[in-house]
Amino acid sequence: MFEKIIQLPEKHFLGYGIMMPWENNLEIQFNLWEKAVSSQKIEKLKQLCGSDNVVGIFCYRCDKEKRTFSYHIACENKKNALSTEFEDLKINAGTFAIFKNVCSDFSDRFKSYNELCAEVWKQWLPSSEHISLIELETFGCVEGYASLEIYTPDNPTVVPYQLEILLPIRKK
């Protein structure tokens, strides 16, 4: 559900990700998290960056012709660390709308995620005075603007968890 609108400063992250199709991508996204947890990449990122928080970075870049977008698992780079293993990702300062949802049953994680996204894209955005800066058909595909997904705890393979989506927006 919609929580509030906030201003965020520019943030730098280190992470890794993949390109995935616009449609039917949730299983790919959750599999990426499962592999990150089992391979210890999340712990490695936390140590390298000096951060306890891990985020999903949704739609940092996209390819409109191929109808794909990126999904990264990343940590805020508080140590300004350099890495050949992980990608440097800069999220521009700006206005973000925050949405929250809780998933309490592992078998409902896709449903829970889709319900929150439906609220964002089908209810809140059409009735608000804002436009998403990652809207693929209009403004999207501008590197530096991405949605941040924060899972608490920072592992969506364990339930219950809270999902917080920070969506970059601007006035219409």
Regions found by a protein language model. Give the residues of each.
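A solvent-exposed interaction/effector surface
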Residues: 1-172
